[in-house]
């Protein structure tokens, strides 16, 4: 008789229809923020993983979970567990460490050392199977082994999700923290080698693809595997089946999965915003009944509270994204008045952990003073902090700020190093950085004034985008043409060049021809070249837009 071990079924409630839908779609494609990855080297897979049948793998997986619970506090319980694991899977990482700790706790140092050495050999083999990137994931035999492997490197797991794509049929992305005051990083693993044996054992449909991840993911989710629950939840979000998605993600979040918490926070806030917009659009009370409006209003506070709660739980797990998002919402008064200070604290915390957007957000608000009192000095500090994180948007924004009248009092500050930061972007072929370097050279800000150097930077920027027809490239050409056509500095003016580049762009780009600011530039370039009648005609088109 073929004995089939069963896992404990703990899953969120969902209808049989929903389950059928999930089974059908997920078998074809599991759309959960996947990234392109390469299949692990088969030789390394053979070295890393013992050839065990899937029924034994299920038992080993359960034992691995038990062993992880006892590793630190109750090593005497590890003897029977470790032995049972290695009996079925002799190369198992967790089994080897379990027996190492068990024998060491008994004072049997030599035996404990032998198992410790075999454990370290397993660690080495996994390390050599990849580098933890999406392109070269580490090959492991289970979610639990991946967690222990990271723990051996001083990385604490705070979340994760299974992923699937054409190159890697079953991957695992784990979010981990390395030390205190750090932001979670992504670590990638490959478990695709499990699928053939898993599907042969689990699937009743023998015509089903042998590398379909769904049967195994369903089994894992029913065994309270948080990453599997998160994967199903994320897939259902993609399908806009939010009710079922929330059930699965909630089950995952209950096990402190940062990925699930952040996704739930976004879902609840999206639902809140949708209802708020619906009520705002129905101010004349022509569509919704009074009863419907009251029902919708009653949901608003609940959705806001849930979103905030999940953001805070994600923050407790180290989420920099939730620090930024919740900080911004509090700062903007979305959760009521008097939350600006708390919001700014979260934003600054997020910025110090590497989120340049947080510093940039504060820089803009202190520059214009819409929510807080205008403070150019603080704005400059936040711009500088954002730029030093080497965020391209922040570097460009800070440079433009220094050139603007608002930044005039801080232009001579040498510690900013903005030119060096822009040159780093230029090395990465960033055309907007070239334009801004031209602006700095033309104005003599943070560098010596040189019109020749400015023109050189402008032409390099135009050359970099001349073959691209897109909005960003349009903007580069429009800015350069405007500067060189309208400048009052004779040594900088290049009217014919400005007309040539804007003429060509207006011929090539349909989008540019529809924008009044581009028509303004075209008219200015025509006027600078003495073509006044055509300039007036184009200017009229701009006004009519």
Spans of features found by a protein language model:
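Short helix-capping/linker turns of helical repeat alpha-solenoids
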Residues: 91, 223-225, 255-258, 264, ...
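Hydrophobic face of amphipathic alpha-helices that form TPR/SEL1-like repeat modules
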Residues: 229-238, 265-275, 286-294, 298, ...
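TPR/TPR-like (Sel1-like) alpha-helical repeat modules
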Residues: 104-125, 455-462, 532-544
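N-terminal alpha-helical interaction modules that lie
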Residues: 35-79, 139-222
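Alpha-helical adaptor scaffolds
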Residues: 50-72, 471-513, 517
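Structural signature of tandem alpha-helical TPR/SEL1-like repeats
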Residues: 210, 239-247, 274-280, 297-310, ...
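Alpha-helical protein-protein interaction scaffolds
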Residues: 50-128
